[in-house]
Amino acid sequence: MGQKIHPVGFRLGITKEHLSRWYADPKQYPALVQEDYKIRQHIDANLNNAGISKVLIERKADQVDLEIHTARPGVVVGRGGSGIEALRTGLQDVLGDQRQIRINVVEVNRVDADAALIAEYIVQQLERRVSFRRVVRQAVQRAQRAEVQGIKIQVSGRLNGAEIARTEWVREGRVPLHTLRADIDYSYKTAQTIYGILGIKVWIFKGEIIPGQEETSAANAAPLPRRKSRRQQFEDRSEQ
């Protein structure tokens, strides 16, 4: 079951928290959930080059609090805070009212240990028609330098323009999806290529979270084993 279920949803309430944290009358839930979706869509569309990792949403009466985790806070804030003001104005237009919107920007410290940012990097490279083998190898190397305990990357679709779609994946280190106390960071994104859509999934194992103790630091854990001149486990069928 751990291989099929969403790694974050599987651990909600154990080691993961909801990205939307608010309470409302049951009759208002559908409208507020749709608002959250529109907010995330607007942020992704207008800040697609800012390296957005995640967006946390909280609600207090007539106030909406947003916490944007990004690898490039300067792009989000803008010169003199102009980016924040433009984003706030756009969100008020999306919501259709003048509710107060507070935006807090948080910088992601370990960019190469964030599944969403690694998946976004792979998407950008694939859309530039770079070979998926090279992209996956570079992404794994970046994660190794960030000293994560394990990473798994899966790419699906018409890889390198092959006639028949297939799925290829590579894993380095440990990625224990069945262990609930394991801190698994997961992301899924799609790349629009001239041959069609490619699906990218990234799992990153950062350590174990034990109740009553702090999270096992990836820096103190043993880094991923480096293997000498081992070829990636890919099968080339692009010319068949």
Curated annotation (Swiss-Prot):
Function in brief: Binds the lower part of the 30S subunit head. Binds mRNA in the 70S ribosome, positioning it for translation.
Molecular function (Gene Ontology), one example: structural constituent of ribosome
Domain (KH type-2): residue spans on this chain: 39-109
Keyword Ribosomal protein attributed: yes
NCBIfam families linked to this entry: rpsC_bact
UniProt keyword annotation of Ribonucleoprotein present: yes
Family according to the record: Belongs to the universal ribosomal protein uS3 family.
GO terms, biological process: translation
Stated name of the protein: Small ribosomal subunit protein uS3
Gene that this polypeptide is encoded by: rpsC
Top-level taxonomic group: Bacteria
Subunit structure: Part of the 30S ribosomal subunit. Forms a tight complex with proteins S10 and S14.
Cross-referenced SMART domains: KH
Keywords: Ribonucleoprotein, Ribosomal protein, RNA-binding, rRNA-binding
Species whose genome carries this gene: Picosynechococcus sp. (strain ATCC 27264 / PCC 7002 / PR-6) (Agmenellum quadruplicatum)
Cellular-component GO terms for this entry: cytosolic small ribosomal subunit
Region span, Disordered: 216-240
